[in-house]
A protein has these predicted regions:
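Short active-site oxyanion
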Residues: 33-36, 66-68, 103-106
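Acidic, PIN/NYN-like endoribonuclease modules and their adjacent C-terminal/linker elements
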Residues: 10-17, 85-86, 96-137
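Acidic catalytic patch
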Residues: 42-46, 63-85
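Alpha-helix capping/helix-boundary segments
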Residues: 43, 76, 94-95, 113-114
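Short beta-strand scaffold positions
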Residues: 71, 90-93, 109
């Protein structure tokens, strides 16, 4: 699942709590206009799979903060196939391809495997905690 689900995960682990705090900090900066949020059809799709309607509605509210929503096309599929060859799971590959299509500077993920495997792209793939540390003034 994507970072917008992190606040709804079991907060018993320190790492999950830190990532949750980072996600909330990032969302606040988006609301204040300091950052821009890019959304995609993949985020909508994953959210639609969530059986918890309350969480789905919370994430739908986050999607309303996005200035742009990336829709599927052939370029995204081709790009995603390249990521899959690097060992990235199909859904994650589509997320990355959407971010590239949207011209994102950063791709935020709590998945260490994606951070490690998504190389040689014109976008920084980073954990939300590291993003906050790197970008807060």
């Amino acid at each position: 699942m994507n970072i917008y689900n992190r606040p709804f995960d079991d907060q018993a682990q320190v790492r999950i709590r830190l990532e949750t705090i980072a996600v909330f900090s990032i969302l606040q900066r988006i609301k204040e206009g300091d950052l821009q949020l890019l959304w995609s059809f993949m985020l909508d799709y994953e959210n639609s799979l969530n059986p918890n309607i309350d969480i789905r509605q919370e994430i739908e509210q986050v999607s309303a903060l996005a200035g742009n929503t990336i829709m599927p096309d052939d370029a995204i599929l081709i790009s995603a196939q390249t990521f899959e060859k690097q060992g990235i799971k199909p859904r994650d590959a589509l997320h990355l391809a959407c971010a590239i299509k949207g011209g994102a500077d950063y791709f935020l993920t709590c998945d260490d495997k994606i951070v490690k495997r998504a190389t040689d792209i014109n976008m920084k793939v980073i954990n939300p905690v590291m993003f906050v540390e790197e970008t807060e003034v």
